[in-house]
C-alpha cells in the first residue's frame, strides 16, 4: 500500500510543479491530471479494500477501531465518480495526449 500511496503523491507533486512553473500547456496537463485522478482513485479503492481485509469484521462496524475504514470503504466509489467517472477521464486523457 505504501508504494501505491507514494507513487500517487509523487505524481501529484510533479503535476503541481508543472502547473506552477507553466511547463505544460493546459490541454496536455489536463490529460495528465485526468490520468492521475484515475490512478489515485484506483489506489484509494485498493487501499480501502486491503485495510478492510486487515481489520476483518471490525471494518464493517460504524463504531470502534474500524469506523474510519468503514467510512472510507463505503465512500470510495463516490470519490471515484465525483469529478468524472474513470471511463470519461480515460477517454479525455487519450484525446488530449500528445502522440
Describe each PLM feature range.
Residues 1-99:
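Alpha-helical interface subdomain recognition
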Amino acid at each position: 500500500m505504501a508504494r501505491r500511496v507514494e507513487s500517487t503523491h509523487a505524481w501529484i507533486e510533479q503535476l503541481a510543479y508543472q502547473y506552477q512553473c507553466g511547463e505544460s500547456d493546459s490541454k496536455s496537463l489536463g490529460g495528465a491530471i485526468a490520468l492521475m485522478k484515475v490512478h489515485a482513485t484506483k489506489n484509494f479503492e485498493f487501499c480501502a479494500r486491503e485495510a478492510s481485509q486487515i481489520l476483518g469484521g471490525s471494518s464493517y462496524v460504524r463504531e470502534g477501531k474500524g469506523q474510519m475504514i468503514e467510512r472510507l470503504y463505503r465512500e470510495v466509489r463516490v470519490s471515484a465518480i465525483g469529478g468524472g467517472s474513470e471511463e470519461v477521464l480515460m477517454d479525455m486523457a487519450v484525446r488530449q495526449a500528445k502522440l
